[in-house]
């Protein structure tokens, strides 16, 4: 029962944070330390529940996705959409494959997450103040190949635990001239191949036999992550039509500073 409760908590954390610019990986590391949810199963669990979050995006955009897949002839709207997503996917995919092992071995710690949270927060504030109201593109369908590549290059920052894939791609979108909402929508679509590839790679490397209780925990985490992420995606897009990203930046700063203090006091290692 204790494992199922932890799975429920971690599923909520993943669903709440995956598509907000506050780093799901960072929060999973931090919360996992506090509730003592660590080890090989925890690592695989965190990978699997990301699939729940991916499915939430697919479900939210199901009409647009299905419409785009009906016509993939070169030059068509559907082809252009997924070609641009593919271009944006390449930089993080290549660099991620080359650095995956090093990152897992050396950067998955509360302290490095705290530094990334703070650095990302400062970048979010500066970029929004500088580019937030200068956008020329208010629809992700208007993004061209060069801008897609710029967003993809920005996504490389998210390989550093705590930086946030969502924050990195939204900031990249704003630098490319997109409105915050258009950047967020592009980020959501880019999440589909990016997270699916990362999850598949990690599962191929780390999947192992599990007990019945562990299978139940996976199911609880997956479903909880899906339902929570589905709620967050809808509300976050509505929020961005009227509000700033700065509250998320201030939250990142607060959590980052708190984590550094906890590490310094050896409360968290």
From Swiss-Prot:
It is a multi-pass membrane protein. This is Undecaprenyl-diphosphatase. It comes from Thermoanaerobacter pseudethanolicus (strain ATCC 33223 / 39E) (Clostridium thermohydrosulfuricum). It is found in: Cell membrane. Belongs to the UppP family. Its main location: membrane. Keywords: Antibiotic resistance, Cell membrane, Cell shape, Cell wall biogenesis/degradation, Hydrolase, Membrane, Peptidoglycan synthesis, Transmembrane, Transmembrane helix. Catalyzes the dephosphorylation of undecaprenyl diphosphate (UPP). Confers resistance to bacitracin. The chain crosses the membrane at residues 41-61, 78-98, 107-127, 148-167, 184-204, 213-233, 248-268.
């Amino acid at each position: 029962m204790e494992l199922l409760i932890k799975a429920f908590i971690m599923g909520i954390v993943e669903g709440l944070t995956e598509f907000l610019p506050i780093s799901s990986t960072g929060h999973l590391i931090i919360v996992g330390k506090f509730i003592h949810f660590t080890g090989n199963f925890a690592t695989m669990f965190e990978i699997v529940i990301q699939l729940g979050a991916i499915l939430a995006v697919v479900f939210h955009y199901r009409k647009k996705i299905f419409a785009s897949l009906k016509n993939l002839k070169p030059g068509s709207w559907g082809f252009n959409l997924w070609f641009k997503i593919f271009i944006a996917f390449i930089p993080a995919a290549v660099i991620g494959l080359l650095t995956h092992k090093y990152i897992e071995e050396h950067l998955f710690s509360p302290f490095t997450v705290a530094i990334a949270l703070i650095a990302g927060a400062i970048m979010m504030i500066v970029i929004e103040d500088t580019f937030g109201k200068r956008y020329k593109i208010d629809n992700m369908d208007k993004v061209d190949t060069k801008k897609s590549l710029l967003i993809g290059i920005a996504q490389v920052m998210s390989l550093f635990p705590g930086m946030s894939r969502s924050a990195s791609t939204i900031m990249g979108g704003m630098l490319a001239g997109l409105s915050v909402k258009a950047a967020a929508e592009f980020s959501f679509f880019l999440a589909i191949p990016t997270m699916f590839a990362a999850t598949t790679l990690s599962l191929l490397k780390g999947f192992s036999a599990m007990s019945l209780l562990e299978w139940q925990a996976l199911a609880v985490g997956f479903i909880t992550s899906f339902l929570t992420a589905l709620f967050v995606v809808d509300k976050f897009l509505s929020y961005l039509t009227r509000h700033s990203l700065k509250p998320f930046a201030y939250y990142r700063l607060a959590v980052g500073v708190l984590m550094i203090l906890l590490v310094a006091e050896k409360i968290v290692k």
